[in-house]
Amino acid sequence: TNTATTPTATIAPDSIAEIEAAVQQARLDLEDAYFAAASDPGNQQLRQEFRTFYSPEAFGPLEDFLDDLLADGTTLRMSSDVPKSITFPGDFEFLGPKEARLRICRVDSDVVRIPPTNGRAEVIVDDRVVATLTDVLLALVEEKWIVTGGDRIMQWQERDSCDF
C-alpha cells in the first residue's frame, strides 16, 4: 500500500529554477549591501539598506559587527591580492512557497583596516582570507528574499575556496 501523500499543487521545474536564480541574486545583492555598509559603518542609509536583506533576528549579530567597526574606527576595503567570491556549490532546496535553503561558499578576503587620515598610512588590522560553507535559510517577505537564519557547515582559514 502506498502511504505517501500526493501534493495538491506542484511547481514546475523551470519555476523552481527561476526561484533559485532569484534567491541567488538576492544573496549576491546582500553581499554588495554588506560591503557598502562595512566600508562606511557610520552611514545610517547604507546600514538600513543592508538591514533590509535580513529578518530582525538574523540581523542582530551583523548590527553588532558594524557597531564594532565604528567604535574601533575601522572599515573594510577589498583585497588587492585575493578576490572575494560567492558561489553556490550545493543543492538549492525549496522548502515551501515562501521559504528556501541555499548552500553558499563565501570567500571573504575583505581587509579590515584603519583608513589613512591626515597623512597617516592605512593600518591593516586583519587581512586573512577565510572560506565559509554555509546553508542559508531565506524567506520571501514583501516580494524580497531575506535571510532568516542559517548554519555554518565548515570554515577554512587562508583558503580561497570551499573545495575539500
Protein language model features and the residues they cover:
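Residues that cap or initiate secondary-structure elements
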Residues: 58, 108-110, 142-144
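Secondary-structure transition/hinge residues
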Residues: 35-39, 110, 140
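Short, surface-exposed linear patches
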Residues: 47, 83-84, 123-128
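Short beta-strand edge/turn micro-motifs at domain boundaries
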Residues: 101, 122-164
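Surface-exposed, charged secondary-structure patches
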Residues: 70-121
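Core segments of small alpha/beta cavity-forming domains
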Residues: 7-81
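Amphipathic, hydrophobic N-terminal targeting peptides for secretion and organelle import
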Residues: 1-11, 161-164
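Generic alpha-helical propensity signal that fires on short helical segments
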Residues: 34, 41, 68, 77, ...
